[in-house]
Curated annotation (Swiss-Prot):
Transmembrane segments: 21-43
Disease per record: Muscular dystrophy-dystroglycanopathy congenital with brain and eye anomalies A12: An autosomal recessive disorder characterized by congenital muscular dystrophy associated with cobblestone lissencephaly and other brain anomalies, eye malformations, profound intellectual disability, and death usually in the first years of life. Included diseases are the more severe Walker-Warburg syndrome and the slightly less severe muscle-eye-brain disease.
Tissues with expression: Highest expression is observed in brain, skeletal muscle, kidney and heart in fetal and adult tissues.
Identification of the protein by name: Protein O-mannose kinase
Role played: Protein O-mannose kinase that specifically mediates phosphorylation at the 6-position of an O-mannose of the trisaccharide (N-acetylgalactosamine (GalNAc)-beta-1,3-N-acetylglucosamine (GlcNAc)-beta-1,4-mannose) to generate phosphorylated O-mannosyl trisaccharide (N-acetylgalactosamine-beta-1,3-N-acetylglucosamine-beta-1,4-(phosphate-6-)mannose). Phosphorylated O-mannosyl trisaccharide is a carbohydrate structure present in alpha-dystroglycan (DAG1), which is required for binding laminin G-like domain-containing extracellular proteins with high affinity.
Residues bearing attached sugar chains per UniProt: N165, N220, N235
Modified residues (N-acetylmethionine): M1
Keyword list, A-Z: Acetylation, ATP-binding, Congenital muscular dystrophy, Disease variant, Dystroglycanopathy, Endoplasmic reticulum, Glycoprotein, Kinase, Limb-girdle muscular dystrophy, Lissencephaly, Membrane, Nucleotide-binding, Signal-anchor, Transferase, Transmembrane, Transmembrane helix
Protein kinase domain residues: 81-350
Enzyme Commission code: 2.7.1.183
Species per Swiss-Prot/TrEMBL record: Homo sapiens (Human)
GO biological process: brain development; carbohydrate phosphorylation; learning or memory; neuromuscular process; protein O-linked glycosylation; sensory perception of pain
Top-level EC class: transferase
GO molecular function: ATP binding; carbohydrate kinase activity; phosphotransferase activity, alcohol group as acceptor; protein kinase activity
Length: 350
């Protein structure tokens, strides 16, 4: 019988991959990995946070809580919350870092009975505006003039530069993340102007430090409105406008319509001071965004692309200023355009 060839018994011998083909495969794999890295760098998603709106009204969920809990009562605040240390004090409230069932929380107490109306207004706004743009309310006790909110260890937005200068946060100290912070801020203003309780104006904003102190920086680098003690209502249909306080304001941070219009020869009198609407918040957006953008690589490029919308925000005529929604849409377009351009340039270099 004729013998079968040796190769037929063992099967076909594997073909050797030419070195050039192997090199091409390696290069293709490297390009794929580089693209993934680029996508992560330029379109880095924020860490997801628990959305308090997933709980029904009057309930909350923080940290690793799986279920929603009702707002804490006076008795629960008195017996279950342990104060640790004071972390802040303003004209209306003093704030204590506290602990509730192994959760770090912020306990706010009224500083003076003279400020009780402001305290109760802030509490009512906090209750009415619960959602992704506002710090989470955990409970309150009007009898004790206290309220409990979620604690955010990075603190006030005024700490932004100090925080981003820390080495562990260098990866988020980019123009992309800073522009997203500016978008967060404008989103909050837009929410207040279209809130469930009408058009609200952020009145505690007569200078940059005061404005920044009204907001919190979260651990995933987003912004939350925190201090809602001065949110008067504007109602255009009924002609209801606002005045932020009863004192004369100065400087170019506040909108022109907030300044005394009758010159130095006429003494300031609150009854003669004209009222105004929510467009005072729009005037301040460029200054706050400039702070948030900082002075890092790429921030001036972003400012250049935002020049036109910021110029419109600074119109002397309030009605000619854009809405917060207009500003937000422009910010999104600039972010998308610059990010796409940088990704395209980076890929061309591969």
């Amino acid at each position: 019988m004729e013998k079968q060839p040796q190769n037929s018994r063992r099967g076909l011998a594997p073909r050797e991959v030419p070195p050039a083909v192997g090199l091409l495969l390696i290069m293709a794999l490297m390009n794929t990995l580089l693209y993934l890295c680029l996508d992560h760098f330029f379109i880095a998603p924020r860490q997801s946070t628990v959305d308090p709106t997933h709980c029904p009204y009057g309930h909350f969920r923080i940290g690793q809580m799986k279920n929603c809990s009702p707002w804490l009562s006076c008795e629960e605040l008195r017996t279950e919350v342990r104060q640790l240390k004071r972390v802040g004090e303003g004209a209306v409230k003093r704030v204590f870092l506290s602990e509730w069932k192994e959760h770090k929380v912020a306990l706010s107490q009224l500083t003076s009975l003279e400020m009780k109306d402001d305290f109760l207004h802030g509490l009512q706004m906090l209750k009415s505006l619960q959602g992704t743009h506002v710090v989470t309310l955990l409970g309150y006790c009007e009898d004790d003039n206290t309220m409990l909110t979620e604690y955010h260890p990075l603190g006030s937005l005024s700490n932004l530069e100090e925080t981003l200068n820390l080495s562990k946060y260098q990866n988020v100290n980019t123009w992309q993340h800073r522009l997203e912070l500016a978008m967060d801020y404008v989103s909050i203003i837009n929410y207040l102007h279209h809130s469930p309780v009408g058009t609200r104006v952020m009145c505690d904003s007569n200078d940059l430090p005061k404005t920044l102190s009204q907001y919190l920086l979260t651990s995933n680098f987003s912004i939350l409105a925190n201090d809602l003690d001065a949110l008067p209502l504007v109602n255009h249909s009924s002609g209801m406008l606002v005045k932020c306080g009863h004192r004369e304001l100065h400087g170019d941070f506040v909108a022109p319509e907030q300044l005394w219009p009758y010159g130095e020869d006429v003494p300031f009198h609150d009854d003669l001071m004209p009222s105004y609407d929510e467009k005072i918040d729009i005037w301040k957006i460029p200054d706050i965004s400039s702070f948030l953008l900082g002075h890092i690589e790429g921030s001036d490029m972003v400012r250049f692309h935002l020049f036109d919308i910021h110029k419109a925000c600074k119109s002397q005529t309030p009605s000619e200023r854009p809405t917060a929604q207009d500003v937000l849409e422009t910010y999104q377009k600039v972010l998308d355009t610059l990010r796409d351009a940088m990704m395209s340039q980076a890929r061309e270099m591969l």
